[in-house]
């Protein structure tokens, strides 16, 4: 009798917290650890990696709670790794306060994670890692959609944001590098792309090219096999009317405009160091909204130091009148090393939370109106697979929407009228029949 001499694969449990930019780095780590078997069973995993977020207080707390919870239940001989932004930002403090963790690393060693795990060694490379076409990634969560990172770092000086302090200045990839990566992903079957960075509209400005995103749109359009693409995280002062036109004229890029505004009054934009004045901002936003089938998403901060009742009221009125398709609101929190932290005109925490709640309710209403406007319409969707809600429903996403954040459409058929089975990851035309809560229901036409 022959017995197999092959050793069972070691297992890896990965938790990626925070933004989609973090997710790209997590996928690079998975690529470096491809000889491990991915598992949802954290308790018995040989290696556990948490790619942390250090953006705001709630994200920091989530990162700490997640890693301590995983430590509590893990097996003795496993390796627990803390990576990413929080680890980078507080490297000295965390290494002293969390002896439970075996390996600490920040934002510079994603492509060396296999070495650090094997050697059970912490390391903080001073240069921020930027994924390129040479990094083999394991794309997660989709068989047809991938995020592609344009750049790292940021040259803006927003009063409330500490990201440049640990991610550094803007560092763009070359256009050639991006094109190579996208072509390689298309060859693997990916057809839908979301381009991300801290400040996407500044792409290539560090290389003295001011219209980097327009060039990106032109080059991506030439790649055969791409069905749809979108750009996330535009910045007001580096977004131009010509860029909006370029996206709107594209046959590949959908009219998806994601621009965090943070506020709208002249005084608050000045305090927050947010570039363009209100008139130019309104011109940009109205230009986006004027495009056919446009989808406009943004974020706001409530309770930033210096925000008066008049400022907040003006912000609420603006959000109510503009009617964003989607928006988020964050409660202001002090971040070490920022100019906002040192201001003396702080808003009381109770009032910050109250304002965030009020603005959140307005946003919920405008989002609901956006969803209600879809009922009766016919449009194209990607069908992702079976819904988690019910085994007889399929989960779909409007092709213009970004994955995970913009909503979910339930399809109540699993085959076409000719009896042909619906294929996951494909585009179908559907008609929206009703809205139940915040979920759209649809039937497949073709």
Swiss-Prot record:
The Radical SAM core domain, residue ranges: 140-369
Similarity comment text for this entry: Belongs to the methylthiotransferase family. RimO subfamily.
HAMAP family with a match to the protein in the record: MTTase_RimO
TRAM domain mapped to chain residues: 372-446
Gene Ontology BP term (one): tRNA modification
The organism's taxonomic lineage, starting at the top: Bacteria, Pseudomonadati, Campylobacterota, Epsilonproteobacteria, Campylobacterales
EC number(s) from the headed UniProt entry: 2.8.4.4
Annotated residues for binding of [4Fe-4S] cluster 2: 154, 158, 161
Protein name listed in UniProt: Ribosomal protein uS12 methylthiotransferase RimO
Gene name in the database record: rimO
Domain (MTTase N-terminal): residue spans on this chain: 10-122
Cofactor(s) it depends on: [4Fe-4S] cluster
Gene3D superfamilies xref list: Methylthiotransferase, N-terminal domain, Nucleic acid-binding proteins, tm_1862 like domain
NCBIfam families reported in the protein's UniProt record: 30S ribosomal protein S12 methylthiotransferase RimO, MiaB/RimO family radical SAM methylthiotransferase
Residues that bind [4Fe-4S] cluster 1: 19, 53, 85
Organism: Aliarcobacter butzleri (strain RM4018)
Keywords: 4Fe-4S, Cytoplasm, Iron, Iron-sulfur, Metal-binding, S-adenosyl-L-methionine, Transferase
The protein's role, per its UniProt record: Catalyzes the methylthiolation of an aspartic acid residue of ribosomal protein uS12.
Reaction(s) the record says it catalyses: L-aspartate(89)-[ribosomal protein uS12]-hydrogen + (sulfur carrier)-SH + AH2 + 2 S-adenosyl-L-methionine = 3-methylsulfanyl-L-aspartate(89)-[ribosomal protein uS12]-hydrogen + (sulfur carrier)-H + 5'-deoxyadenosine + L-methionine + A + S-adenosyl-L-homocysteine + 2 H(+)
Entry's localization field: Cytoplasm
Single GO term (MF): aspartic acid methylthiotransferase activity
Enzyme class: transferase
